[in-house]
C-alpha cells in the first residue's frame, strides 16, 4: 500500500507556506517532512499534528493508493 502526500504539498502552496513553516507550526521534525516528500510512511501522530496546524482533515492531505 502506497501513500501520496500530493494534496498536502498543494495545500501548502495554497496557504503560501514552505515545508519549514509546516515543521514549526505543526511541531514536527524536518525528517518527517523529508520522509513524506519521498512518499514514506509517518505516524498518525504526525498527521494529526499537521491537520491541527493546517485546520484540515487527513483526507485533505493524504491519499492511500491500493
Descriptions of predicted regions:
Residues 32, 46, 60:
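Residues in the helix-turn-helix
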Residues 13, 27, 38, 66:
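Residue-level detection of the helix-turn-helix DNA-binding "recognition helix"
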Residues 1-18:
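A short, Lys/Arg-rich alpha-helix, primarily the initiator
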Residues 55-66:
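Short C-terminal boundary/hinge segments that cap the last helix of small helical domains
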Residues 12, 23, 51:
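The alpha-helix within a helix-turn-helix
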Residues 28-42:
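Recognition helix of helix-turn-helix/homeodomain-like DNA-binding domains
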Residues 39-52:
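Short, basic-rich loop-to-helix N-cap that marks the start of a DNA-contacting helix
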